[in-house]
Amino acid sequence: MPTLHSKILGEGQPLLILHGFLGMSDNWKTLGNKYAEEGLQVHLIDQRNHGKSFHSTEFNYDILANDIKQYIAEHNLQNCIVLGHSMGGKTAMQLACSYPELVNKLLIADIAPKFYPPHHHEIINGLKALDLNTISSRTEASNELAKHISNAGVRQFLLKNLYWVEKGKLGFRFNLDVLADRMEQIGENIDASATYNKPTLFLRGDKSEYISPLDTDVIKTHFPNADIQTITNAGHWLHAENPKEFLEKSLTFIKS
């Protein structure tokens, strides 16, 4: 089986960072460098069907967690701290519950262990409407995408995935067809009986609805040692919207 693509920064205890749906390891480069400066060996990982990692029709959280298990083995990593955002948070939860011996501490950014109804249709439809055979620049792609996605920040996030497949031809790094087809799986919960008893921190954005006060019980059911903290002035992309507070709270947890 092919291995996941990653960028490794710094030296020290391994910190594995898992991006969200339609994201990539590069989304975490700025914070990754900050963690590396604090004496951590940061692994910015592209999950399957994302970034520079391999494409596959097989896609669910058991499989994604298994990919990370294999990555840890291939890199001979011990005592890992795992940080996952959104879809990457679900992967991280499943990994920690299935293979607790591999995960020393767990950090989850703005996602709870529950089912989320598919809600990315607008984004997927907008991306599918782009005819990359006729689009010759990022600006043109952005203008076309704006007809479907009004939020400039979301457009910029998505267009980070554009690259030159060959001279004059743009393509997406993510596997759009499979991800569009697997939207139900993205929202799925981790295994119902899954638990992880080691230190766990959930960080939620105060402007995000992904983790509500009602989710405390379900979080504690799966993660009895979980602490839930709020990042101010931040929505679902809390690490990008308030990186200073995200870094402070996450480092306090990592170093405790």
Residue spans of the language-model regions?
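Catalytic active-site module of serine/aspartate enzymes centered on a nucleophile-bearing elbow/loop
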Residues: A226-S256
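Conserved serine/cysteine hydrolase catalytic core
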Residues: K167-H222, D227-T230
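Alpha/beta-hydrolase fold catalytic core
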Residues: M1-L16, E37-L40, L77-Q78, F223-P224, ...
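Flexible "cap/lid" loop of the alpha/beta hydrolase fold
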Residues: Q94-C97, N104-S136
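Conserved alpha/beta-hydrolase catalytic His-Asp/Glu region
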Residues: N133-G187
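Gly/Ala-rich beta-loop-alpha elbow adjacent to hydrolase catalytic centers
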Residues: G84, G88, A92
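Conserved HGGG/HGGXW glycine-rich cap/lid loop of the alpha/beta-hydrolase fold
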Residues: K7-F54
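Active-site loop/oxyanion-hole signature of alpha/beta-hydrolase fold enzymes
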Residues: E37, Q41-L83, E248
